[in-house]
């Protein structure tokens, strides 16, 4: 297992950080109260120290790969600030063990100012200001201000500012700093003494505030007691008045109870008469119920009869449709099985394929067959047909804003668009029948083929499942 040599500063191996004698450079001797000065100047310096307070500090750690700090310490108010890295933080910093360097920033504030950046240290290997001083982080150079001590797994290193670097160069450090100590230059009033003075002043102020609060509390309690006594006297008078009102109300309630007793006797006799009426109504209801059962049985018989009639009608319709299919037989053409004829008359919409007389006659047969079938099946046509043999017509009652509603079902008319629209309406009536019985439409404009499919469906008896038969249970 390889050992880390001195100077290999990894963030993951950091154990503690210590900031020595934190002072702002521009206010280096702000709290240094000289005992040789006169009493007035020392009093001014003391008031200034009390008003501005001692310096507070916290530390943030940064790495090159992250914009935000990877760790922020708690705030400390000690002159020499030591921040230890515990096991949880060490596990968190373990992910940054491959960083080449890391940055330590100190943030300072007095009691009257917000925190601001105090100093920044870049912890980099072979830095001239970062020196190894041993394995004990407790002993350090006391006279150096704004000094940084970093304790790693392989030892303790000291990082100083440029002002203290000359002093460091004049000093030779032994292998262990446990035997090394230099007395610190001390001012008339040290930071510790000023802190005690500040705390004492705060205690005195708190005592005065507490005194005024206690006095105000006692005065408030006395005032509250007087108000409470006055409220109780008013409450006693109110209770006496309420007692008199309750006595008067009690007398009224006695009179009311007497009246209610009289009313109760009257209500009792009224209920007795209503009971007799109810018994009579009950007997009448039983008679009505017997009549209802008789009517329900009669209705059931009529419903069953109606069902039988509907079934017989459906069979009769089937028989009539069979007769119609014999009167107007729709069969494949002898020469071309892909085409159908009605009574051996062809029906084609291709130009010049059949003459107008044959087409008018076949359309007239089909129109009469369709109108008769709609009457048998009790289904109204969306576009009614005016049967007149080969001069039949069809009505368009649905299309809005048209100059005429009657369209001829024979081709010998001008303009030809009227005849084409009439054929379209006739085909829509046939398709409507197919959709009613759930039959597919193979070729939307092959009228005879679709009509043949409709007749075969009705003659097979499958249309009976579409007959609307209703039954009412008693």
UniProtKB/Swiss-Prot annotation:
Q: How does it sit in the membrane?
A: Peripheral membrane protein
Instruction: Provide the disulphide bond pattern.
Output: none
User: What are the protein's GO molecular function terms?
Assistant: SNARE binding
| Entry's localization field | Cytoplasm; Golgi apparatus, trans-Golgi network membrane; Endosome membrane
Q: Name one GO cellular component term.
A: fungal-type vacuole membrane
Record keywords: Coiled coil, Cytoplasm, Endosome, Golgi apparatus, Membrane, Protein transport, Transport
Q: Which residues form a coiled coil?
A: 271-300
Chief localization = cytoplasm
Single Gene Ontology BP annotation: protein transport
As for what it does, the entry says: Involved in endosome-to-Golgi retrograde transport as part of the vps34 PI3-kinase complex II. Mediates the interaction between atg6 and the pik3-ppk19 core complex, leading to the recruitment of atg6 to the membrane.
Which family does the UniProt entry place this protein in? Belongs to the VPS38 family.
| Record text on subunit structure and interactions | Component of the vps34 PI3-kinase complex II composed of atg6, pik3, vps15 and vps38.
Q: What is this protein called?
A: Vacuolar protein sorting-associated protein 38
Organism lineage string:
Eukaryota, Fungi, Dikarya, Ascomycota, Taphrinomycotina
């Amino acid at each position: 297992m390889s050992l880390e040599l001195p100077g290999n500063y990894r963030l993951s191996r950091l154990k503690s950080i210590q900031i020595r004698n934190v002072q702002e450079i521009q206010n280096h001797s702000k709290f240094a109260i000289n005992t040789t000065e006169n009493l007035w100047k020392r009093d001014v310096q003391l008031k200034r120290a009390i008003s501005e307070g001692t310096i507070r500090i916290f530390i943030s750690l940064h790495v090159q790969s992250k914009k935000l700090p990877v760790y922020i310490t708690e705030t400390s108010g000690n002159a020499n600030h030591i921040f230890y890295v515990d096991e949880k933080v060490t596990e968190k910093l373990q992910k940054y063990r491959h960083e080449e360097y890391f940055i330590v920033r100190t943030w300072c504030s007095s009691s009257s100012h917000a925190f601001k950046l105090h100093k920044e240290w870049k912890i980099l290997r072979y830095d001239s200001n970062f020196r190894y001083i041993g394995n004990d982080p407790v002993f350090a150079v006391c006279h150096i201000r704004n000094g940084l001590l970093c304790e790693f797994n392989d030892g303790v290193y000291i990082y100083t500012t440029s002002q203290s670097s000359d002093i460091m160069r004049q000093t030779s450090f032994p292998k262990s700093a446990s035997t090394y100590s230099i007395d610190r230059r001390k001012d008339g009033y040290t930071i510790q003494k000023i802190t005690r003075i500040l705390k004492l002043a705060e205690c005195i102020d708190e005592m005065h505030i507490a005194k005024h609060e206690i006095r105000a509390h006692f005065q408030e309690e006395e005032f509250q007691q007087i108000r409470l006594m006055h409220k109780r006297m008013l409450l006693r008078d109110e209770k006496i008045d309420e007692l008199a009102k309750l006595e008067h109300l009690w007398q009224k309630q006695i009179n009311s109870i007497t009246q209610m007793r009289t009313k109760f006797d009257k209500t009792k006799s009224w209920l007795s008469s209503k009971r007799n009426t109810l018994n009579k109504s009950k007997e009448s209801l039983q008679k009505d119920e017997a009549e209802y059962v008789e009517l329900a049985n009669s209705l059931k018989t009529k419903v069953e009869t109606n069902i039988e009639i509907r079934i017989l009608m459906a069979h009769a319709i089937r028989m009539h449709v069979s007769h119609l299919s014999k009167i107007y037989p729709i069969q494949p053409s002898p020469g071309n099985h892909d085409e159908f004829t009605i009574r051996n008359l062809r029906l084609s919409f291709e130009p010049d394929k059949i003459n107008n007389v044959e087409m008018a006659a076949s359309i007239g047969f089909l129109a009469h067959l369709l109108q008769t079938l709609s009457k048998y099946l009790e289904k109204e046509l969306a576009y009614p047909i005016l049967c007149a043999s080969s001069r039949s017509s069809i009505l368009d009652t649905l299309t809005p804003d048209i100059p005429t509603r009657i369209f001829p079902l024979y081709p010998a008319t001008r303009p030809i668009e009227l005849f084409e629209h009439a054929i379209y309406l006739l085909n829509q009536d046939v398709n409507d029948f197919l959709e009613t019985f759930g039959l597919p439409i193979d070729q939307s404009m092959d009228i005879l083929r679709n009509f043949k499919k409709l007749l075969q469906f009705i003659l097979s008896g499958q249309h009976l499942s579409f007959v609307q038969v209703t039954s009412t249970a008693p």
